[in-house]
C-alpha cells in the first residue's frame, strides 16, 4: 500500500492527501487536549466515535441545504472531505451560559441566554485563540463582509437544527464551535462548513440531570469520557440500544493482538 502524504496534523485530527484533486482524508485521533493544549491526554476510542457522530450530523445538515466539506466516511477513523481554505475564525454559538462566558461575565453556569449569542475567536494556538469582534475580522480582512454574513446565517441555521435534533433525544445543546472554509470553484469561492461537529466541540448536557456528555468531562477531570461520547452516539441511533456499547476499533484491536 502506498504511503499517503500528510498535509497537516492538528490536536485531534490528521489531514492526508486525498485520492482525487481537491480532496483530503481526515483522520480522527484519540488525543484529547484542553485549555489550548495545556492539558493533554488520550480518550481511547474517541476518534472512532467522533468520526461517526460528525458524519451523522454533517449528513443531516447537508440534507437541509447546509454546504459542508464532508463527502463520505471511509472507515472507522477516516472521512473523505473537500479541500478548503480555512477561514482563521472559530465561531462559537451559545444558547446557555457555560465555560469562558460564565467566567468572563460572571453569569451562573446553566443560565439560559435571552437570545442565541455568536462569538468569534482568532485561530492562533500561540495566542490562545483570542476573542475578537466583527471589527477585528473586517480590519484584518480575515473574511469579507459577505462571507461573514454567510457564516452567521449558516451558524444560526445549524444551531436551530442541532438544538432540535439533540432535544429530541433528551440532550441540551449548551454551546458549540464551528469552522468554515472557502471552497474554490474556478475563479470564485463560497463558504462551506468544515472541520467536525462532535462532543469534542459541543457542550451537551442531559436535559433531566444536567450530566455533561462532552469534553468537559476531560477538562474538569470528571472521568467517564468514553461513556459520555458513547451515550451521545447511542441516543443519536449510532450505537445499539442496551447491550455492549463498545465501539470496535480495528486499529486498536490489532495493536492489542501484537
From Swiss-Prot:
Pfam families: SAICAR_synt
Matching InterPro entries: SAICAR_synt/ADE2_N, SAICAR_synt_PurC, SAICAR_synth, SAICAR_synthetase, SAICAR_synthetase_CS
Domain of life of the native organism: Bacteria
Reaction(s) catalysed (UniProt annotation): 5-amino-1-(5-phospho-D-ribosyl)imidazole-4-carboxylate + L-aspartate + ATP = (2S)-2-[5-amino-1-(5-phospho-beta-D-ribosyl)imidazole-4-carboxamido]succinate + ADP + phosphate + 2 H(+)
A GO term from the CC aspect: cytosol
Pathway where this protein functions: Purine metabolism; IMP biosynthesis via de novo pathway; 5-amino-1-(5-phospho-D-ribosyl)imidazole-4-carboxamide from 5-amino-1-(5-phospho-D-ribosyl)imidazole-4-carboxylate: step 1/2
EC code: 6.3.2.6
CDD domains named among the record's database cross-references: SAICAR_synt_PurC (cd01415)
Top enzyme class: ligase
Keyword ATP-binding applies: yes
Entry-linked Gene3D superfamilies: ATP-grasp fold, B domain (3.30.470.20), Phosphorylase Kinase, domain 1 (3.30.200.20)
GO molecular function list: ATP binding; phosphoribosylaminoimidazolesuccinocarboxamide synthase activity
Entry-linked HAMAP family: SAICAR_synth
Record-stated family: Belongs to the SAICAR synthetase family.
Protein name listed in UniProt: Phosphoribosylaminoimidazole-succinocarboxamide synthase
Organism of derivation: Sphingopyxis alaskensis (strain DSM 13593 / LMG 18877 / RB2256)
Amino acid at each position: 500500500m502506498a504511503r499517503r502524504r500528510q498535509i497537516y496534523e492538528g490536536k485531534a485530527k490528521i489531514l492526508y492527501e486525498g485520492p482525487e484533486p481537491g480532496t483530503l482524508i481526515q483522520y480522527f485521533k484519540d488525543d484529547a487536549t484542553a485549555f489550548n493544549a495545556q492539558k493533554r491526554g488520550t480518550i481511547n476510542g474517541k476518534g472512532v466515535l467522533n468520526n461517526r457522530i460528525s458524519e451523522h450530523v454533517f449528513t443531516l445538515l447537508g440534507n437541509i441545504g447546509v454546504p459542508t466539506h464532508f463527502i463520505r466516511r471511509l472507515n472507522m477513523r477516516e472521512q473523505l472531505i473537500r479541500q478548503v481554505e480555512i477561514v482563521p475564525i472559530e465561531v462559537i454559538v451559545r444558547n446557555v451560559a457555560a465555560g469562558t462566558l460564565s467566567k468572563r461575565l460572571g453569569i451562573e453556569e446553566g443560565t439560559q441566554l435571552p437570545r442565541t449569542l455568536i462569538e468569534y475567536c482568532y485561530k492562533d494556538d500561540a495566542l490562545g485563540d483570542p476573542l475578537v469582534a466583527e471589527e477585528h475580522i473586517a480590519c484584518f480582512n480575515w473574511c469579507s463582509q459577505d462571507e461573514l454574513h454567510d457564516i452567521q446565517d449558516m451558524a444560526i441555521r445549524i444551531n436551530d437544527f442541532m438544538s432540535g435534533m439533540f432535544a429530541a433525544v433528551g440532550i441540551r445543546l449548551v454551546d458549540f464551535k464551528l469552522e468554515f472554509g472557502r471552497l474554490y470553484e474556478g475563479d470564485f469561492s463560497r463558504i462551506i462548513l468544515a472541520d467536525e461537529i462532535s462532543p469534542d466541540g459541543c457542550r451537551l448536557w442531559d436535559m433531566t440531570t444536567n450530566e455533561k456528555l462532552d469534553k468537559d468531562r476531560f477538562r474538569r477531570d470528571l472521568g467517564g469520557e468514553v461513556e459520555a461520547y458513547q451515550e451521545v452516539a447511542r441516543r443519536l441511533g449510532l450505537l445499539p440500544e442496551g447491550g455492549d456499547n463498545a465501539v470496535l476499533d480495528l486499529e486498536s484491536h490489532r495493536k492489542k493482538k501484537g
